A protein has these predicted regions:
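Subset-of-secretome marker
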Residues: 22-149
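Sec-dependent N-terminal signal peptides of Gram-positive bacterial secreted proteins and lipoproteins
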Residues: 1-22
């Protein structure tokens, strides 16, 4: 279960940092003993700056408790992130043996300055004005095992 939480934390952090012009798509997947996770990221940008990211995360498990735990953790995290940094909209639902989370982060509303200040390691992915760059988002996602096109 700790592996689950670690993976969710990393993916959620990535979700925070990614965020109209060009579109970059990244995806990742992970198979664990009790569940499988697949995540698709659609990163929209204006020039070299990320403006919006849309994430679809699907978690499949035969164990309803695993899905219910994921649902609670994800909803709590997204609600907290939206309260602290703004810019989040999300919907998490369970249908049978599948949990689907649809998340959008609008970087025009997201307080990236505050986020970078609270998460110093993120300076690696932003420019000098604390704007998330497309190259930074790509580097960040790749560091978590995602592939980007």
């Amino acid at each position: 279960m700790k592996k689950i939480l670690s993976l969710v934390a990393v993916l959620s952090l990535c979700i925070l940092l990614t965020g109209c012009g060009k579109v970059l798509k990244c995806s990742s997947s992970s198979e664990q003993k009790n569940y499988n996770i697949s995540t698709d990221y659609k990163i929209e940008s204006s020039g070299k700056i990320v403006t919006k990211v849309t994430i679809k995360q699907v978690i499949e498990s035969k164990d309803k408790k695993v899905l219910q735990n994921f649902k609670k953790q994800l909803e709590d995290q997204y609600k907290s992130n939206n309260t602290v940094y703004g810019g989040y909209s999300y919907k998490v639902k369970i249908n049978g043996k599948k949990l689907t989370a649809n998340i959008t982060i609008d970087y025009k509303k997201f307080d990236l300055d505050k986020f970078v200040k609270a998460n110093g390691a993120m300076k690696e992915y932003v420019n000098k004005d604390n704007k998330l760059t497309v190259d930074g988002a790509k580097k960040m996602y790749k560091s978590t095992g995602a592939t980007c096109k």
